[in-house]
């Protein structure tokens, strides 16, 4: 005979959690807004302003996640309750197993919405850029920066964030000196923003024949793409614009012409680069968009003193403080902020970062 009480307890628990989220997300207001946005998107005139139409489309997706999940939880839990009652009456183990399976699926849906509670920032829903910069240490540090690049590309692919390599600067012997990735998709910035900081590698270097342990550093800085409604005042006289021949992965198609663009905002010494298009004009437009996003995020960090990242953002080693150590010989990767560890170093380096990201978001970083 099957155990009914644990299932009934789980149904009540999920119902209580759904009710809590209904209040937290202001379900009634979101449902009303969803109807308004859907009506606007059905209008034939909406595409007269493509950027507004895209913004409305993003808003609708975010609203649907909340409204549809809560609606599905309400109806789904009612259906499961009915299945459990039927299974008990008929003493039908197969029906009971179906009810349990459906309950597990509903819990996963609810957990996703609970996780979204942590995305409370005004730009968490946005696409984002991720800059990687190797620290001092020559070839070993540049190889580490390349490993970090691969790690985040893999993470982005696994989460369908369409990672796009905007720019990469090759290392002197191996690896890279720096790179920029763009991630496109809902909550890309919210998911990655706690990865800003210094990532430290400890290993026996393959570039040192003596087999000594080396410590290398690599900085990561994550910032959201901003829309045109946010005014960023940039004086053209403050910019130094250089063209150069692209190098490295992502630039192989533009090496024959100097189409890559580097823009330096002289007052803040903020540098952005773009080389992923054959057109110098398109690369320049993309780099300017990236520069505006970066300057905006740096200004937000300055205003957000409790994060203590603004001044670190100007240091040579990178942006933010040291956040995670990757000690490969001991098979241990540890987040220094949350204490979360993983012994599966290869899995993490292959992009399995969710455990670290979720813990940092839950801790309010």
From Swiss-Prot:
Key words of the record: Cytoplasm, Methylation, Protein biosynthesis
Pfam families: PCRF, RF-1
Transmembrane spans: none
Highest taxon listed in the record's lineage: Bacteria
Database matches in SUPFAM superfamilies: Release factor
Residues with the N5-methylglutamine modification: 252
Keyword Heme among UniProt keywords: no
One Gene Ontology CC term in the entry: cytoplasm
Processing and modification events after translation: Methylated by PrmC. Methylation increases the termination efficiency of RF2.
Localization terms from the record: Cytoplasm
InterPro entries found in the cross-reference section: PCRF, Pep_chain_release_fac_I, Pep_chain_release_fac_I_sf, PrfB
GO molecular function: translation release factor activity, codon specific
Keyword Protein biosynthesis in annotation: yes
Stated family: Belongs to the prokaryotic/mitochondrial release factor family.
Described purpose of this protein according to its UniProt entry: Peptide chain release factor 2 directs the termination of translation in response to the peptide chain termination codons UGA and UAA.
PANTHER family (alphabetical): CLASS I PEPTIDE CHAIN RELEASE FACTOR, PEPTIDE CHAIN RELEASE FACTOR 2
Name of protein: Peptide chain release factor 2
Underlying gene: prfB
């Amino acid at each position: 005979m099957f155990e009914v009480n644990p299932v009934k307890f789980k149904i009540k628990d999920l119902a209580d959690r759904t009710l809590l989220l209904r209040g937290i997300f202001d379900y009634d207001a979101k449902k009303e807004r969803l109807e308004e946005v859907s009506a606007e998107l059905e209008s034939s005139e909406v595409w007269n302003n493509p950027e507004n139409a895209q913004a409305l489309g993003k808003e609708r997706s975010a609203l649907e996640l909340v409204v549809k999940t809560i609606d599905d939880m309400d109806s789904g839990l009612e259906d499961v309750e009915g299945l459990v009652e039927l299974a008990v009456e008929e003493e039908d183990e197969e029906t009971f197993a179906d009810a349990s399976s459906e309950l597990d699926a509903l819990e996963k849906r609810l957990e996703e919405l609970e996780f979204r509670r942590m995305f409370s920032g005004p730009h968490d829903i946005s696409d984002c850029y991720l800059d990687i910069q190797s620290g001092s240490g020559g070839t070993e540090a540049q190889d580490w920066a390349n490993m970090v690049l691969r790690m985040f590309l893999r993470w982005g692919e696994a989460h369908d964030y369409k990672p796009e390599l905007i720019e990469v600067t090759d290392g002197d012997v191996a690896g890279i000196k720096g790179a920029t990735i763009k991630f496109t998709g809902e909550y890309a910035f919210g998911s990655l923003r706690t990865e800003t900081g210094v990532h430290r590698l400890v290993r026996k270097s393959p570039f040192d024949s003596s087999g000594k342990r080396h410590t290398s550093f690599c900085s990561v800085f994550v910032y959201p793409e901003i829309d045109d409604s946010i005014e960023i005042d940039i004086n053209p006289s403050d910019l130094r614009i250089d063209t150069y021949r692209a190098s490295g992965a992502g630039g192989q198609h533009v090496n024959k012409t100097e189409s890559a663009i580097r823009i330096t905002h002289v007052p803040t010494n903020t540098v952005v680069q773009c080389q992923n298009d054959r057109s110098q004009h398109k690369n320049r437009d993309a780099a300017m968009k990236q520069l505006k996003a970066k300057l905006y995020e740096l200004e937000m960090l300055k205003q957000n003193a409790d994060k203590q990242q603004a001044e670190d953002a100007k240091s040579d080693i990178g942006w933010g403080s040291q956040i995670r150590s990757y000690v490969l010989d001991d098979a241990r990767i540890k987040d220094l902020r949350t204490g979360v560890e993983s012994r599966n170093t290869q899995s993490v380096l292959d992009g399995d970062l969710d455990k670290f990201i979720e813990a940092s978001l839950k801790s309010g970083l």
